[in-house]
Amino acid sequence: MKNKILIILFTLLFSKIALAENVNIQAKKISIDKKEETTIFENEVRIVDDQNNIIKSDYAKYNKKLNFFTFKKNIILEDSKGNIFKSDNASYDKNNGLFKTLGKSSIVSSEGYIVETENVSLDLINNIASSKNLTKIIDLEKNTIDLDNFEYLSKENIFKSIGKINVKDKIGNKYEFSQIYLDEKQREIIGTDAKAFLNQKEFKLDERNKPRVFSNAVSIKGGQTKFIKSAFTLCDYREKDKCPPWELRAKEMKHDSKKKTV
């Protein structure tokens, strides 16, 4: 039948670990180059590996010698943890369990966090995804997190990053950090070397006020923000970052965005 989906079962032998593993491949079109030991799959390609990772694409090329896949166009990888990765160019080093995207990529985590980034490296053995490129994450509380890079530990449901980090919540409060942890299960953001710029009018005695909190660490969870070893001021910015005329210091300070209190 012309449109019949071809199903091919490859038994792949790994010399390093001396195990035989199966990969199921489906496609509507297939061509084989025996000399080069490569196989090309096109149209509705679907691959399921031994770890139940599912890869779909318009095009896939398999190199038998290297045990290596190359993918193009409309690539969707759903890993065994339920995370979904999308890109238009990717590769899969089956021997090392390493899946890589090239160019613009997106992720929807198993907990519903949305990630926009580039050049993702996914270790399917250790369940770790990472990118050294600029990244935007939107969490379930509609916080937008802009990062220089990220690492995602999918077993622990934790994102982490070190570098220039900016967070903006749904009511316009802005935070700057040098290091951040996003705990998906707890729906919590933890950051260090924090600067918080509060947007709520209730904190302003005058339109010129710039309510802000600087602290060693911050925890943001469920509409409440906890500042550790912090300083709070309403005063306007001063030239050359001089200290404000007054500030309130505390070992612990809390900001409730719903009650609009500090």
Placement of each model-derived feature along the sequence:
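Structural signature for solvent-exposed beta-strand/loop edge elements and short helix-capping sites
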Residues: A20-V262
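Sec-dependent N-terminal signal peptides
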Residues: K4-F14
